[in-house]
């Protein structure tokens, strides 16, 4: 079990490294996700009716988590995002293997993605 979760953490770290560059000038308070212990900035734009996310974090595991969420939901329409099964995170066992503060941050990240989608329906 330990090795399996070590592999998943290593995968999250690699995902975090794969995020697009996030400009320092975009790291503003209005882009911070509230409820995360680490600082997580989330930005978006709408292109051809699809929401495209970009993000960064000052913590490597958290950066991997937001990268995973971006991979799942970026490029979808707001309606697709809102009708998505967000329990996928629970199905892969991510939430229960995070510290309570990281798990709360994960919930906050998902809530922010859903909020952005609902603002753009």
Model-derived segments and spans:
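Glycine-rich active-site/cofactor-binding loop and its immediate structural neighborhood
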Residues: 53-61, 70
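Solvent-exposed interaction patches of small proteins and small membrane subunits
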Residues: 30-36, 56-57, 79-84
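Alpha-helical support elements that line or immediately flank enzyme active sites
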Residues: 65-76
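N-terminal intrinsically disordered, cationic/polar leader segments
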Residues: 1-39, 44-50, 76, 89-121
């Amino acid at each position: 079990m330990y090795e399996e979760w070590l592999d998943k953490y290593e995968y999250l770290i690699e995902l975090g490294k794969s995020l697009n560059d996030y400009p320092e000038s975009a790291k503003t308070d209005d882009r911070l996700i509230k409820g995360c212990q680490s600082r997580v900035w989330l930005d978006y734009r709408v292109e051809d009716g699809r929401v495209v996310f970009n993000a960064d974090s000052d913590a490597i595991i958290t950066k991997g988590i937001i990268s995973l969420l971006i991979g799942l939901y970026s490029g979808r329409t707001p309606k697709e995002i809102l009708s998505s099964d967000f329990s996928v995170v629970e199905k892969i066992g991510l939430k229960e293997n995070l510290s309570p503060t990281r798990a709360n941050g994960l919930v906050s990240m998902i809530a922010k993605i859903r909020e952005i989608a609902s603002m753009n329906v």
